[in-house]
From Swiss-Prot:
Belongs to the transketolase family. DXPS subfamily. This is 1-deoxy-D-xylulose-5-phosphate synthase. Mg(2+) binds at residues 152, 181. It comes from the Bacteria. Its cofactor is Mg(2+); thiamine diphosphate. Keywords: Isoprene biosynthesis, Magnesium, Metal-binding, Thiamine biosynthesis, Thiamine pyrophosphate, Transferase.
Amino acid sequence: MNFNFNKYPILSFANSVENLRLLSVEQLPQLCFELREYLLDVVSISKGHFASGLGVVEITVALHYVYNTPFDNLLWDTGHQAYPHKILTGRGEKINSIRKKNGLHSFPCREESEYDSLSVGHSSTSISAGLGMSIAAEKEGRNRKTICIIGDGAMTAGMAFEAINHAGEIQSNLLVILNDNQMSISRNVGALNKHLKILRSVQNTQKNRKKIRLLNKKLFFKDKRIQNHSISFNSIFSNLGCKYLGPFDGHNIFSIINTLKKIKNKKGTYLLHLVTKKGKGYLPAELNPIKWHTISSRDSSVSKSLSYSDVFGTWLCEIAAFDKKLIAITPAMCEGSGMVKFSRLFPNQYFDVAIAEQHAVTFAAGLAISGYKPVVSIYSTFFQRAYDQLIHDIALQKLSVLFAVDRAGIVGNDGQTHQGVFDLAYLRCIPGIVIMTPSNENECRQMLYTGYMHNKGPSVVRYPKGYGVGALLMPMNRIPIGKSLIKRRGKKIAILNFGILLHNAYCAAEKLDATLVDMRFVKPLDKSMILKLSSQNKFFITLEEGVISGGAGSAVNEFIMVNKIFLPVLNIGLPDTFIPQGTQEEIRHVYKLDSEGIYKQIFYWLRQ
């Protein structure tokens, strides 16, 4: 999509940071207006992360105007807000390809541009990486600046505070910009959110500084290093050793530039608190930033099936209605996980712990020890952030906690940072854990119930993003642990399917006249079924939507080797690589996990 010069005259000129710096300060408000309009035009067509970028237009322009990027490092935490950054760094005409196959990455990516100092996608990493870059620059004697832009939602994660704690001690030359829009994807929660609210209230007093100082000289003091007399006081960040500045209006381009220029060459760790509006410039997004966080593609026909997240949310409400011991936990993913209705109906049984996966898991451990029945809803890609807690605090103590692992397998457009393809490999080695892989919505429902009723340790139900196949939801019944189902009987070939590729596998099995088994459980495996099938077939095929290395197929391989079962096995899944962006259908086609691809992989393997 090319810039329309008549509509975007200044943006057309400022299509690189070199040209941006040729503009006068007086031209920057118009640039911000055009940049925001361009975002509205492009993202509404191309789809993608919408509201976050609208909120940081002025911050983005100011940073590239004042700092010498790409020599100076800009680190965008999480990356939802980086679309304006991409546009100003030479990628504006490709922005309509974002999140598409072979298009621009959803988030900053070092392989994509020298202006992307850090590849991101998960939250709360910027300050740690930025501190490392700052130390490296000091050791090299290079006057390179490092600036981290982090949202108040991402600031709730423990890793961000670990980095602030370190930075405040060593006083490296680092600027942290806190983009405070009171949101992550959902509305922010927790004591930090309340603290920032108190800090934001200072904005309303800055017009009356003299009066306030007379009333309470101890509350505020004049920072002589900043000529505009910004207010500094006892914030949590100053207590951790940062030079805290703000809060300031994050949409006042002149104020931001003046402040950045004055602290640009100062020594030590600064935290600049800027208050912004998520969705700024587009009223529907300002009023409902949760809905407009991302614009998703819409199919021409509305699916009549439930999404797996909806299945989970409905199941959760049904259980909570008769079991007051159920406690549902989410790390800041209420909407995406299908928990909105539950949070409203059962507020006393619901905890949003913010972006704190480690805390979420050990919090669940404490509840389980105390006789409650925790259900932790977590995305597959974020579950890996709490791996030690799962092992040390849950599995080692044999605590009965159910993990509803959403977005498992191929997720799609958010790309390599968000694909949920590693969970089976990193979960399978944990002693005593039960891992279930539903093949449709009803199986998901029954497995959730089975895992909830399991009282001998942790259990996991991993299910995909998106809609199911339209399976009828049946009354809840426990599934026998470790038992599979034969879905089709054939000859010579046995396909052992784990999870949602069952329908695709069935099409391939029909062509090959193969036996098809819905294995259901990755751990414990249905060993009796494998032994039985090994005596009736000449070839085994395992199928999963996850990495082959260490996954469900590897579990089958290990079992047949230990039991001296000598027959060829083909493991079908995802290769040893990071899976790029694209639609789920496109990615399955590329990696031959659609029905035709599965058939061809088996067919050509048999011919070898």
